[in-house]
Amino acid sequence: MSNESNIITVPILGKDTVRVGFGIHQYICTEILENFKSSTYVVITDSNIAPLYLEKIESTFNKSIKDAKAEARLLTYVIPPGESSKCRAMKAEIEDWLLTQSCTRDTILIAMGGGVIGDLVGYVAASFMRGIRFIQMPTTLLAMVDSSIGGKTGIDTPLGKNLVGAFWQPLRVYVDMVFLHTLPPRQVINGLSEIIKTAAMWNENDFQLLENNSAVLLDALNKPSVPGEYKFDSIKPLLQKIILSSIRTKCEVVTLDEHEGGLRNLLNFGHSIGHAYEAILYPQILHGECVAIGMVKEAELARYLGILKPNAVGRLTKCLVSYNLPISVNDPKVKKYASFKHCPVEKLIEYMAVDKKNQGSKKRIVILKAIGETYEKHATVVSDDDIRFILSRDVKVDEFTKSSWDVVVTPPGSKSISNRALVLAAMGNGTCRLTNMLHSDDTQFMMSALESLGAATFSWEDGGETLVVKGNGGKLAVPKEELYLGNAGTAARFLTGIAALVSSKDGAKVVLTGNHRMKVRPIGPLVDALRANGCEINYLEKQGSLPLDLSSKNGLKGGIIELAATVSSQYVSSILMCAPYASQPVTLKLVGGKPISQLYIDMTIAMMASFGVNVTKSTTEENTYNIPCGKYQNPPHYEIESDASSATYPLAIAAITGTKCTVPNIGSASLQGDARFACDVLRPMGCTVEQTATSTTVQGPPKGTLKPLESIDMETMTDAFLTASVVAAVACNVSEGDPVTRITGIANQRVKECNRIAAMVHELAKFGVRTGELEDGIYIFGKNYKELKKPEEGIYTYDDHRIAMSFSVLSLICPSRTLIIDKACVEKTWPYWWDVLHQSFGVKLTGATSVASDPLKGSISKNASIILIGMRGAGKTTIGKIIAKQLNFKFLDLDELLEDYLEMPIAEVIFRMGWDAFRLEEHKVLRKFITEHPEGYVAASGGGVIEMDESRNLLSNFVKEGGIVLHVHRNLEHIKSYLSEDQTRPTYKDQESIDDVYKRRHVWYRECRSHYFISPVLSNQVIDEKIQYSMSRFLDVVTGSSQVLQKFKTKKRSTFLTLNYPRIEDALPTLRDVTVGCDAIEVRVDYLKDPKSSNGISSLDFVAEQISLLRCSTTLPIIFTIRTISQGGLFPNDKEEEAKELMLSAMRYGCDFVDVELGWSSETINILYQHKGYTKLIMSWHDLSGTWSWARPHEWMQKVELASSYADVIKLVGMANNLNDNLELEEFRTRITNSMDIPLILFNMGRFGQLSRILNKFMTPVTHPLLPSKAAPGQLTVKQLNEARVLIGEILPEKFFLFGKPIKHSRSPILHSTAYELLGLPHTYEAFETDTVDEVQKVLNLPDFGGANVTIPYKLSVMKFMDELSDEARFFGAVNTIIPIRIGDKLVLRGDNTDWRGIYDTFANALDGVSLRDTNGLVIGAGGTSRAAIYSLHRLGVSRIYLLNRTLANSYRVQDVFPPDYNIHIIDSDNIPSEELSSVTLSAVVSTIPADIELPEKVASVIKALLANKADGGVFLDMAYKPLHTPLMAVASDLEWKCCNGLEALVRQGLASFHLWTGMTAPFDAVYQKVIE
């Protein structure tokens, strides 16, 4: 424990306010009582800190009071933890409590806690009784060095953090570092971020201290706690020094600028952008972590503006990473904790607008000039455009318009040389200083991994210009965590060799992993070579790629090592560099053909010699190298040559723009093959090239005069082929022949960061450039640059730095601005490439976020192709054709493609070649389909396509890239029955039964599928006729076409019915009745009872069948809910894994909503969010205890904070103990809805809670008397809800009218009155017959006017009263429905036309989901109704519409009304040939002629002839309904048409108007029956 002599005092504002020490509880209590007399001391803390420290503080303080014989008392108050407590309500609660305790102006408040407690209690002190004294006792590192110092106090508001508060200095700040002992490691690191920030902007020496001691600090931090020991004992002096350095800086700045006049702004380095990220990512990502991201972004901004050197950004980034702090939103830590959150750029800029540093609308950011120094002594004004560029994922590149330009560009250090130098220096003895090091993602991954392996320590000198590597002589250890390498292929290959040298004990293994692209890049030949030499290496996922685990008892054995080197020279370099540390000298034999990129092998050997190891090439054996045992001896200094591959980009800019560029440090003496690019590629294309041993200058020819290269072998500079390709794209200056450039020798580029050859072909095509692949290269037809097309969807970069930089070059000559997606990928080799374009070349760059890169758009690509998998006989072909028809895609059967390719049927293929060979050919066809048809196709695959690992990987990667793999299935017994009748298919391999095959494949289908469709089954029969309808609903959700949630948001009120049946089949007889007035159906999965389940939990297939059956039985959206026992349901609380699989499956089933309880683990919730696709998540919580208060809503706010990270909808349900609980809930609803966009479902359960259900307007759960039971206590029916809302004035009675004459016999009044009665609405509907249209105006102005229908003769004349018209009203030139829209005091009358809806809805109901796309339709008659009929058929997808009328002239008049794409064909009944009549097959017919009109004989005969040619499922609608069954209906019925009468269309048209007025759907059957009566 500390005594007073061990306590360090730091002055601030002229007072010795800050006291720092270890274990100073006793000192604190004594010092307060001695120096700050009071009658009342109040310790305020939170419920996290209280159990750890409050009792000890109380007892020590009370003992001190007793010892001092002071007349004082100590009070304590504990509040809920978290940011939600930092609010007005909590401030008021504390103040009220203080008053009840008779606290007076001499009271001293002691804030014991983190930043929330300190800010809140400080603000209470600043305002209580106009200001009382307070003391800060911070318990987190973040609060110790930041929030507790300087007197800033405040609370949050709905519009932002800390917007209300005061400057109020504490009497003391007691920094007791003993609190850090119980602080979780992540929270300590959170505070270290602020310490790094302070050093980065104020003191380079402090920054160096942090740089050099990260490993020491983290080792102590991660050391397990031992009872009775202080975790940081071993580093007390270091820890104290670091904390004090930050405290002193802040105290110094605050003393100079207490009230934030300018200088104090500097303490906000990293905060302007960091706070914007925090507004979205908190609480999953902590304040310090967000500030770390903000620091990097603000440093990048300073670099972009030309103020901060690139190495300083790299140095800052390296320091942050060394403390396990995130440096971007793509950082693994952010992905781990908040992968479900997205940070839209415009939202970030919007948050940045609310910043106290800003000057009005001008944003001010702290700009670094160097590590430890800022650009100005206050925050600097920065434009939104520059901020937007830094924050944006993508970039728009403008055309380069300068006619002359002469620039010198120095590329960063070579990635190849940097990575090799890092390995050699780390493995060597002694210290080596590396200069011109590349600061990039790749080298950052390499350095971090080498440190984790214990290979070396790194530090910086010369302001970050020099990297000091202290090698450990090849001594390595198994790291504590896996080594994450992103997409750094060079690091992955080199480190695989290094990791093979690690001697592991007790089964410890080195694990190398990376991002999803790294996990498909090849490393197999290197692994094979190392395995053959005794290393134990396992693939953890895909064979031949990372992740790997490696273990070896004695490291590399040595001797002869054979390696295939035709794919990557990096395999060779990896073994070369680790070979000196093998147990025996190594003889490395390169086998399998000519090694690729020989110059890079030579580079490695030359560099090894510089570090003291000489490799000799055999003179007797080809491609064989001898490497002696030894250790690298580090040279004192090693300068890294600039990257020759990167140098090609500025030189290429000169070439295509006709300007001049010099690269001063790459010349003919370079070790790098790409240094030849200017001489071997650009000079033959027409450029003037000057190259010395150390520099290269290119002067481009006049714009547009570059020459193509007939053929060039780029095997010695393969990476530069991308640059050559974009230059060749505009090389069209030829005297004869085609302007084609052929590049060869680059086959290895297919297995780089991406398949670069295929990528170049694909992306150049977007510019309109004709290209194609060669066996080992590419050909490009040059194009006049003025004719380049704009890539409409942007250039996709494949996470490949060289793709991005190459296309940025071509963008400069494109006449229109070019979007390049994922600009950050250049950080791999040239992190500041965009800065060079902006500063050196003067190119205008604009930040952008494309649809293609916007994660909010869902994981499924627009128009993504769909691959169907599933058992033989599951219906893949049938369903595939249905999908293709509904989406207007093309359909392919992959089995048929295979048969065409091999020119024999499948059965013969298997008979001749065998099953294994057949599977390989099947795999090839699948791969070809995925490559050639990524969009716009539906493919049915063979049932066993998932049998091969390679095919399963193809399917899985297809899903990752945004494709859809749909598993199609039907009841297995039906499949067996179907296949027993089909003798054309080959028997299964080894005569397996269908049951055995499905049992084996079932897991694979689940592994590969992104979605799942199971055919609906009712009474053990597949309902084939319902598949089209069910599929249509399914596709709406999985392709993102559904707008259900958006529709709910725009409705005044919405409800959903809860189904709690054991089987959906039991609900079907009453389904229409019970869902009257509902907007959605909730399936309570916990109520379902699977008869085959042994544990009471329904199987995935059983639930899938239930969902499928429900989907084909209703038009309503489906909510999938599993309610646990603890939340008021039936599902076991301890079956989380089963619940997770069911909810994931619900997303694959295409359910509209999935209810996710907030009680599930964060891991489960994260997984659900990541896989939700277009399914919407309802995040829910039910307080069954009734103890949570809406008036003191801290628990509820914590749930809101958690839910808002994931939710599309938040559902919070309490338990009402009295009516007042509902009123408190409404106050909570009002507060929360003002501050968030996510819709809320809020209500209380129980008898007393029914009022809250009535007041809840969004998605209120309802019940129905016909259901077996209520799903929750207090549920009401739709009718009860509406009736109650009428009584409380929530729904006001309105009057509706029918305008026209004559209308006395209209059925509309009975239609609408019935609907109102059934739904409990108080409205009336009456016929308003009038002689003139002007008389209706007085009705339109009635205060209770709810709407009107309009019939003849006023459909046109009433339009003069309308303020706006719907598209349909404009199209028809008539209004039949008037909708009043009240916006405040203003009344807007909207005219609509629903005549067509009666026809459309009648057909939609009769078709039951069957599509009319690409079918023929017929309209009989050419009066006014015929227009609505034609319009409806076109909307239904009918591609050709025949029009038949007795008067031909009227038919042509109707045809002239419609655009040509309606494809209307007039039938002349007098002249139509009989063969034409017989060739027309109809699917839909509408008769619009009165039933009592006798048709001419020829017209009648033509109608009968046409009706005789009916397609399957044809629907006939006669708009006449007097009589109900007309003569034409009789003819159609005899010909087996599905007939509908005009009264049905009339009712459906009326209900369409009803829906427009009320937002509710009325029950058709009950209304129709009443109208008939």
Swiss-Prot record:
Residue sites binding 7-phospho-2-dehydro-3-deoxy-D-arabino-heptonate per the record: 130, 146, 152, 162, 194-197, 250, 264-268, 271, 287, 356
UniProt catalytic activity: 7-phospho-2-dehydro-3-deoxy-D-arabino-heptonate = 3-dehydroquinate + phosphate; 3-dehydroquinate = 3-dehydroshikimate + H2O; shikimate + NADP(+) = 3-dehydroshikimate + NADPH + H(+); shikimate + ATP = 3-phosphoshikimate + ADP + H(+)
This protein's name: Pentafunctional AROM polypeptide
Gene Ontology CC: cytosol
An annotated GO BP: aromatic amino acid family biosynthetic process
Chain intervals for the UniProt region annotation (EPSP synthase): 397-843
Stretches for region 3-dehydroquinate synthase: 1-384
